[in-house]
Amino acid sequence: MTWRTVWCTGAGKGIGRALVLRLAREGCRVAVSARTEGDLVALAAEAKGCSGEVLPYPLDVTDEKAVTRAVDNIEQSIGPLDLVVLNAGNHIPVRAEAFSVKPFRDLVEINIMGVVHGLAAVLPRFIERKRGHVAIVASVAGYRGLPTAAAYGASKAALINMAESLKPELDRYGVRISVVNPGFVKTPLTDRNEFPMPFLIGADDAANRIVRGLRRGRFEIAFPRRFVWGFKVLRCLPYGLYFPLTRRLVTES
């Protein structure tokens, strides 16, 4: 599977940045979006030596109209998109004793509605053309509820459910959809974590795994494998076994 034109949100740092550079090295023309224009300009400059090209389109994914305009401009500039990676997101820990509305509202706007705005802009085009591939970056934290992740985990669970719901309908039109569920990846976001992160991998490693999974047409691209399978086992546990484990996480934190 080859892609000539790609759009990636959340491209300024972390997984998005590494993924863009990987695709540019393969010769793709990659439109990149993030809120911080300086990050995108630096990314485009770093990609100068690649066989592909990186084109900055600064954007706040919570602005529906801005997302639609950006997709219009991108396709006018580089042509119909082959692959869209909806990667923009944030993490805000929420503890029960400091429970408040704002982190939920913020993460719903960025993590969920940011993806919805992207899908609303590209899916009608893909369906009309009967081709295209969209990848939604969620997280293994969306598999099941975890302490301090009431907002973040819920937002990522929504993305997984959304992708599962859309897949059988998009299959009818030849449009691919994938959901990416990483474990811990070393990025500026995870650098803020104050707890151990087992099986931590680098952003370049994550980008390679994502590209490999997308090329193979996988619906779910989850990594690293041992960490993912541990979470999938937890997802199957009855509450009588699951909650004693998560209570230990609260005690240890």
Regions found by a protein language model. Name each.
Residues G10-K13:
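Conserved glycine-rich cofactor-binding loop
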Residues C28-L43:
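Conserved glycine-rich Rossmann-like NAD(P)H-binding loop of the short-chain dehydrogenase/reductase
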Residues P58-R69, V101:
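The beta1-alpha1 cofactor-binding region of Rossmann-like NAD(H)/NADP(H)-dependent oxidoreductases
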Residues R95-A96, S100-V108:
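Substrate-binding pocket helix/loop in short-chain dehydrogenase/reductase
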Residues L119, S155:
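Active-site helix of classical SDR
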Residues S139:
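Residue(s) in the substrate-gating loop at a strand-loop-helix junction
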Residues V179, F195-G230:
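C-terminal helical subdomain
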